[in-house]
Amino acid sequence: MKPSIYSLTRDELIAWAVERGQKQFRATQIWDWLYKKRVQSFEEMTNISKDFVSILNDSFCVNPLKQRVVQESADGTVKYLFELPDGMLIETVLMRQHYGHSVCVTTQVGCNIGCTFCASGLIKKQRDLNSGEITAQIMLVQKYFDDRKQGERVSHVVVMGIGEPFDNYKNVMCFLRVINDDNGLAIGARHITVSTSGLAHKIRDFANEGVQVNLAVSLHAPNNDLRSRIMRVNRSFPLEKLFSAIEYYIEKTNRRVTFEYIMLNEVNDSIKQAQELADLTKTIRKLSYVNLIPYNPVSEHDQYSRSPKERVLAFYDVLKKNGVNCVVRQEHGTDIDAACGQLRSKTMKKDREKVTATK
């Protein structure tokens, strides 16, 4: 199975081409074809010799993904189900915002973090995506825009899809370098957010990278007891370790951290828990932000339900009175399979039913 050429940074592409007797400018031409003209095959690169096109074809594919399902919401949100070369399925979501077009990418096939409310973890991690497979998600959404010929572009990226990005650290960092490259897609670092469930040692590594990419932490509980019950990762990285790493990140980067907090009815949404959350974030208040997220119910996790609006607002009010920067997240795609992992799970179930029916 040939790797995608999207898995190379520009410097890596230059080194690869030079090793094969090409001048540096040849790699620059190829890079332009990929990310500015956004061709789908090497044969479309008209200023590259046929001999070198043949070498490219022998070494790489361009986009390794196949589009299986597309769902479009009334609010313009588009959810894609892509098939990988080995037949596995991943999800990608395009969200239209007032400030631009944001794409949520997947980094792993399945997830081992084990959050008890999440559709992503219904299927255990089967493998990491390589950097080319992550980049390819952006490229196919950008192709959707290019085909519409309205001058639209992917302006923001959130690494919040299926999987734990910091459990696939090397490939995620390569992906970030590719999409941020000024000579390519040129998606600004401050328009990119990486979300982690709380791998404290990787937060420290990320702080040391020196990148301007935003960091979000999936918190979802204000104390160790509850967080360990609903997020298995907390047993390895309890709040003390997590917040030590977050404080290191803030000190090292002077950048704000966003805390994601899914509102689960009568689980983590009480007034007492709001005060606990305010107290937990007190020492980093100036450089932290809390995002309260309405829960998208998952049939396999029917022990959870969405917090009523009045409970969300009461929770929000406590945070605001304590000086916490916070917002209730605007929902997208509520009329389609909105929860992360839902579309993939449903499609896999249908595929299994088809196989069973033919036996």
UniProtKB/Swiss-Prot annotation:
Domain of life from the UniProt record: Bacteria
Pfam families for this protein: Radical_SAM (PF04055), RlmN_N (PF21016)
Catalytic machinery residues: E91 (proton acceptor), C340 (s-methylcysteine intermediate)
Database matches in CDD domains: Radical_SAM (cd01335)
Cross-referenced PROSITE patterns: RADICAL_SAM
Protein name: Probable dual-specificity RNA methyltransferase RlmN
PANTHER family: 23S RRNA METHYLTRANSFERASE, RADICAL SAM CORE DOMAIN-CONTAINING PROTEIN
Organism listed in the record: Streptococcus pyogenes serotype M5 (strain Manfredo)
Family annotation (HAMAP family): RNA_methyltr_RlmN
EC numbers, comma separated: 2.1.1.192
KW tRNA processing (keyword) present: yes
GO molecular function: 4 iron, 4 sulfur cluster binding; metal ion binding; rRNA (adenine(2503)-C2-)-methyltransferase activity; rRNA binding; tRNA (adenine(37)-C2)-methyltransferase activity; tRNA binding
Keyword rRNA-binding: no
